[in-house]
Amino acid sequence: MAATLLDVCAVVPAAGFGRRMQTECPKQYLSIGNKTILEHSVHALLAHPRVTRVVIAISPGDHRFAQLPLANHPQITVVDGGNERADSVLAGLQAVAEAQWVLVHDAARPCLHQDDLARLLAISENSRVGGILASPVRDTMKRGEPGKNAIAHTVERADLWHALTPQFFPRELLHDCLTRALNEGATITDEASALEYCGFHPVLVEGRADNIKVTRPEDLALAEFYLTRTIHQEKA
């Protein structure tokens, strides 16, 4: 069946290991409750009716994914990821050539709220470039002196945002920008940075700050708290 204008595919790069978690198990396979972090992240995407397919890019040597219920989900496609995030995203984009718009979501960002996702998806009505979920910087920001544990100066926090995911773009535009940026040796830290490199200005959609990425050991307990709270609120 051909994709419609309303249908959205999602790409989840899940080939990384996450050494800062200090565990032998890749962070996306750590459990919160009775699900892995990856399952929480993917189910949050599939909970929206516009998301019709999720492509998960995993490491070619990954033996854990096949043990998850996701492996047999009819809306899930699995592809081999690459050494870098951008390589995995490109592999996912190639698997959804029919899609007009794509979401890219971190495998280890399990606390996505449906209202944030809905507001992000709504930008496809007015934007030809796409945008990202982001949260305004609230803390005082310091720039350090290179190579020293010392403050160089305070960074003005006005107009500073924390980039979150999902990030949402026209598939062809994202594919072309990622390809160009990689071919030209640009540093790409997220999908929006590839569009920025090519001269585009994605929209900032304010999202909740509790949409955290599990990166360090202390993040796991915080994500568990946020998810438990959300489940209780939904049941209330």
Curated annotation (Swiss-Prot):
InterPro entries: IspD, IspD/TarI, IspD/TarI_cytidylyltransf_bact, ISPD_synthase_CS, Nucleotide-diphossugar_trans. This is 2-C-methyl-D-erythritol 4-phosphate cytidylyltransferase. One of its GO terms (molecular function) is 2-C-methyl-D-erythritol 4-phosphate cytidylyltransferase activity. Homodimer. It catalyses: 2-C-methyl-D-erythritol 4-phosphate + CTP + H(+) = 4-CDP-2-C-methyl-D-erythritol + diphosphate. The record marks 20, 27 as: Transition state stabilizer. PANTHER family: 2-C-METHYL-D-ERYTHRITOL 4-PHOSPHATE CYTIDYLYLTRANSFERASE, CHLOROPLASTIC. It comes from Salmonella paratyphi C (strain RKS4594). The record marks 157, 213 as: Positions MEP for the nucleophilic attack. It comes from the Bacteria. Its EC number is 2.7.7.60. Keywords: Isoprene biosynthesis, Nucleotidyltransferase, Transferase.
